[in-house]
């Protein structure tokens, strides 16, 4: 009876076998990319000589220089200096409060998901492999069974898609492979018992610690899109291992019609470094630099051997010379015995030519070439040439030389925005119960904000002329900025603030002129500065009106009998008004001035 029920399920053994055949077709189309990923990992670890090892000289020294590694490490440091932060903007005025709450809650959700570590791992893979992949999932077991959003860095080597698609969302099927312990899987899924033979193999990185897969099984996470009865594409999920279906969303009555996620997208965000046509994966800096790095390493290898040979005294020795070779090779002996007479024909030193200057110049030119093609010139690391010593000049050169880094960051920020959209969609679907998040207020204090999916779900539209307009789902825009800025960016921002202060931008009397100047300026946070200047300008107008009223009151008091003293007191109060009002506007010492 159980077999009959299993056959009646939408996803059974036949569907699993067909999915595995599709996986094999996808693997064949991705074989060249997998080989490149494995080779690039060796290049990054400076172990690429394994690909060029001479079988006749297995123990011969093969030096590797770290120019390529240094370039990638510097670019990763640039990425970590510009850690992203989201700001959510509403598209409708009714969603303003929800957008503000999301702007405060999203960074907390990312922090709880350990996103900074994920961001770092994705950037390493983006620079090494050419593509960084981030997975946005719903983990129902998190928070003690309450469930929460999980963010993972995904290994591109374990992902397979339809060959020829440019956007990963256009692939009809998507497979993610992983290795898990067979005994643990069997304990969790009893239907796996007796199916220990693997039916799928996975590519491997080359490791030095001798990893084994004896007790492992390949788990296939099969994501696929299929239309429902209304023609809308639904995302479904199936977990396979050794040809056995462990779980399928189409077999789950709660998800059979709805799909795994309501947003209907694959939970993977691809961020290619350099785009390739007809592929969601790109190529990285290792693919661009490894030929130049290989030439540098070969020259270093030849030069090292030349220096070693030149530093040792070697001899050309005839068989008839009669020299005791053991004594000659022993540098600790002062006397070397000889039988017969020596001459230049039977015994002479072997001279090794030293390094030529043009050889060193050529190697240095290849090093400069590698720096140039990777955009990792000395200026980007703080070095200077040509006598540049002024701090402002060095900063300007560094900013001008960081165009490639800014371009990479823009690509990463676009991918980060797509990740945030997926997170918001998961909140919309799964945040049924209200949760409390600790956020940092505008003045730096801790605040506790309740949040649920109520503000994210569809709201009924008011009827017009007795006609129901249905419901409207809130839609948001995401603007990404750098939460952790580089030292230069912070110094530049501080200098801008000091210049605005010195020029009197915050003086209420200069509000109109300051606003005219700020309209022509563009820097981060300029809208907040404009708002403060407008506030100061409004305050100045109120002060002028109040001073006029006080002057008229003083004149009226002076005309009254005995009103001279009262008029003087009023005049003194009028003189104090600008100081008190300015103090209130600037909010000195973080306290309200009364």
Describe the function of each predicted region.
Residues 1-257, 320, 354-358, 362-365, ...:
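Extended, helix-rich architectural segments
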Residues 84-89, 117-125, 136-140, 306-319, ...:
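Short coil/turn segments at secondary-structure boundaries
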Residues 96, 100, 117, 283-286, ...:
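Conserved structured core elements
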Residues 105-112, 292-310, 331-338, 353, ...:
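Generic, well-ordered alpha-helical scaffold segments in large soluble proteins
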Residues 140, 392-511:
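Extended amphipathic alpha-helical segments with heptad-repeat/coiled-coil character used for oligomerization
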Residues 221-387:
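Extended, charged amphipathic alpha-helical segments
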Residues 512-552:
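Long, highly charged low-complexity segments enriched in Glu/Asp and Lys/Arg with interspersed Ser/Thr
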Residues 555-594:
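Helical coiled-coil/dimerization "stalks"
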